[in-house]
């Protein structure tokens, strides 16, 4: 039976989504792993999104809280809002009370990735504050650490991400994820999928 890894994200302008796509590719590259992209529901009205010049949403399906229980592992992604995850993703997690009550996600591995507007915009604080959500569900936080190797020490060019997970900087919105950031995202997907597969195999 395939190991299921769900990449669940919220993306307003597409930066997080691009990382999510690479993470899915990385996870799917692990033999025996089925990787699937999911979006969390939008909480803003179309009128508000239009005023914010947000592009149309992608075709990735909208996930419901109960569908989380189907997966063996996760990678959660979101843009940063004042050093924390975006409210849309927090609203989705707030709706997982039934799963929490049953501890349906306990023992399942999960990683985190993110996008911020600037280098001091809260990439690590976003990950740190998001970990509390995993803890209450009994999930296992899987950081990438320095497993990405030399790419973690890039100093010549601006690069998002950290030992906590893959990341990118959006700037004024015109900056897109770099090739190195996308490579780090692919690595994160591959890394977490491998760990998820091992954990599932040890409990089979």
Swiss-Prot record:
UniProt-annotated location(s): Cell membrane
NCBIfam families named among the record's database cross-references: flav_wrbA, PRK03767.1
InterPro entries given in the database record: Flavodoxin/NO_synth (IPR008254), Flavoprotein-like_sf (IPR029039), Flavoprotein_WrbA-like (IPR010089), FMN_Rdtase-like_dom (IPR005025)
GO (cellular component) term, any one: plasma membrane
The keyword Flavoprotein belongs to this UniProt entry's keyword annotation: yes
Biological role: Catalyzes the transfer of electrons from NADH and NADPH to several quinones in vitro. May act as detoxification enzyme, and protect against auxin-induced oxidative stress.
Catalytic reaction(s) noted: a quinone + NADH + H(+) = a quinol + NAD(+); a quinone + NADPH + H(+) = a quinol + NADP(+)
Note describing how the cofactor binds: Binds 1 FMN per monomer.
Enzyme Commission number: 1.6.5.2
Broad class of enzyme this protein falls into: oxidoreductase
UniProt-recorded name of the protein: NAD(P)H dehydrogenase (quinone) FQR1
Domain Flavodoxin-like: 5-192
Gene name, Swiss-Prot/TrEMBL: FQR1
PROSITE patterns named in the record: FLAVODOXIN_LIKE (PS50902)
Binding annotation for NAD(+): 13
Effect of deleting the gene: No visible phenotype under normal growth conditions, but mutant plants have increased resistance to the necrotrophic fungus Botrytis cinerea.
Disulfide bonds: none
Membrane-crossing segments per the record: none
Keywords assigned by UniProt, alphabetized: Cell membrane, Flavoprotein, FMN, Membrane, NAD, NADP, Nucleotide-binding, Oxidoreductase, Stress response
Family of this protein: Belongs to the WrbA family.
